[in-house]
A protein has these predicted regions:
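Conserved alpha/beta-hydrolase
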Residues: 1-2
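Alpha/beta-hydrolase-fold enzymes
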Residues: 58-143
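Conserved acidic catalytic loop of the alpha/beta-hydrolase fold
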Residues: 5, 16-37, 46, 50, ...
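Amphipathic alpha-helical segments that form well-ordered structural scaffolds
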Residues: 21-25, 111, 152
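Alpha/beta-hydrolase fold catalytic core
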Residues: 127-167
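Short beta-strand immediately N-terminal to the catalytic nucleophile in serine-hydrolase-like folds
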Residues: 38-40, 65
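Short acidic-aromatic active-site loops that bind/stabilize oxyanions
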Residues: 8-16, 143-146, 150
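Short, glycine/acidic-rich beta->alpha junctions
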Residues: 42-44
């Protein structure tokens, strides 16, 4: 993103903003004014709830799963701990990094590995056959997430943290 909104200066975005952008795209580019359903997982579930509240005439039904209409304190803390893991890397440099903060991105990935997959998933070792051990499964996740942009991840987390469909 060009200055003045580059790096950590990108403006705050709300789930409501995402829904409005999607609605405008659907209408302007595809001529779609009504959706059969909005299906969403996690932050996508938040968007589904927002569609129902903001544009009830434009969506027949919603199928939100693994998400809430409001981010509660536990979710806010979980997100804050992921951000702390990422920003603890000195290379992060308050978001003005010149190279990816690799150890921070790795910490972010490992944090999410504990949340994205359930205790039961890890206990039953469902990471197999893709990985032969927990360490290998974590290494694969870190590698998969390595190209992600740290400031983008934080912007997404902040969007998630602030969401309350009732606001």
């Amino acid at each position: 993103t060009p200055a003045p909104f580059d790096g950590p200066r990108f403006p705050a975005i709300a789930i409501r903003d995402n829904v409005e952008a999607a609605r405008r795209l659907l209408q302007a580019e595809f001529g779609i004014t009504r959706l059969h359903a909005v299906v969403g997982f996690s932050m996508g579930a938040q968007q589904a709830f927002q569609w129902a509240v903001s544009h009830p005439d434009a969506v027949s039904r919603i199928v939100p799963y693994c998400g809430t209409a409001k981010t509660y304190p536990h979710g806010q803390v979980r997100l804050e701990s992921a951000i702390a893991a990422l920003t603890a890397d000195a290379a992060f440099n308050n978001g003005d990094y010149t190279a990816p903060p690799r150890s921070g991105l790795a910490a972010w990935s490992k944090h999410w590995a504990a949340w994205v997959y359930s205790q039961e998933w890890w206990r039953r070792e469902l990471f197999r056959p893709r990985a032969s051990s927990v360490d290998e499964a974590l290494a694969q996740r870190v590698e998969r997430d390595a190209p992600r942009d740290a400031n983008n991840l934080i912007a997404q987390a902040r969007t998630w943290q602030r969401h309350n469909v009732g606001d």
